[in-house]
Amino acid sequence: MQIDTKTNTNKTTAQEWKSFAFVVCIALLIRILIMEPFTVPTGSMKATILENDYIFSTKYSYGYSNYSLSFFDFIPLFKGRIFACEPERGDIVVFRPPNDMSVRYIKRLIGLPGDKIQLIDDIIYINDKKIERTEVGTYISEEGRKYLKFKETLPNGRTYFSYKLAPIFGVISDDRYGNTDVFYVPEGKYFFLGDNRDQSNDSRVNLGFVPFENFIAKAQFIWFSTKITWWDNDIGVINLILKLKPWIESVRLNRIFRNLYNTDE
């Protein structure tokens, strides 16, 4: 009996392509609906989140909006949110800033709709009550800058660390945002701060209030972290080989799989 090897090969190839397409579809669905990785390029959440931390975030935590659907966020599919779940104070949220929809921000949620928010001498007041804030030590950044480290507790009991640049020779380097006007958070919008209080473009400054519709995901943990990125400059085989060793050496092993809500330090 003669076997048609060409037909069998075609069937095998077709099955392989179907399997590949199935895997790709599952991966896309996971990214669109369940979990998405993000890279953090700035230090506004330092030292909770550092530059070049790779974050896993859950898409389902707040339900879904047009802005949270990866690859489709440029298409106005619908308004508002579906399967919405209310965010909590202290959540670390990935969102689209209302003044620049081309980028993503990651900040800590401080103020809920209807709240009255103000900072006085770097202390957060929520509805005229100051939150608990205790200095617990210092933090030295990779660039050698010294920060004062504070443990803050929100009204719902959520605790986290915030950081403020330490004075240099007794001179405070930047204290523009430690005392603010009163902010009244509108319905359907939220007030955000960066944990790196002196170096964050947040709701005190240009960001303003963020609509719930702009929320993308809730940040959960750091799955990878490195001090440098090897794709910053020219891409090429030789360049990758030259950068491979320093890139491997720059991996922050102590940050891998770190829970962003763990304050047991």
Swiss-Prot record:
Keywords assigned: Cell inner membrane, Cell membrane, Hydrolase, Membrane, Transmembrane, Transmembrane helix
The way this protein sits in the membrane is described as: Single-pass type II membrane protein
Where, per UniProt, does this protein localize? Cell inner membrane
Q: Which reaction does it catalyse?
A: Cleavage of hydrophobic, N-terminal signal or leader sequences from secreted and periplasmic proteins
Coiled-coil regions listed: none
In which domain of life is the source organism classified? Answer: Bacteria
GO cellular component annotations, sorted alphabetically? plasma membrane
Catalytic residue positions: S44, K107
Question: Which residue ranges are assigned to the Periplasmic compartment in the record's topology?
Answer: 41-265
Q: Which InterPro entries match?
A: LexA/Signal_pep-like_sf, Pept_S26A_signal_pept_1, Pept_S26A_signal_pept_1_CS, Pept_S26A_signal_pept_1_Lys-AS, Peptidase_S26
Please name the Gene3D superfamilies in this protein's record: Umud Fragment, subunit A
What are the GO MF terms of this UniProt record?
A: serine-type endopeptidase activity
Give the top-level enzyme category. hydrolase
**For this protein, what is the EC number?**
3.4.21.89
- In its UniProt record, which GO terms are filed under biological process? signal peptide processing
Cytoplasmic membrane side: 1-19
Segments passing through the bilayer: 20-40
Q: Please give the family membership noted in the entry.
A: Belongs to the peptidase S26 family.
The protein here is known as Signal peptidase I
Its ancestry begins with: Bacteria, Pseudomonadati, Pseudomonadota, Alphaproteobacteria, Rickettsiales
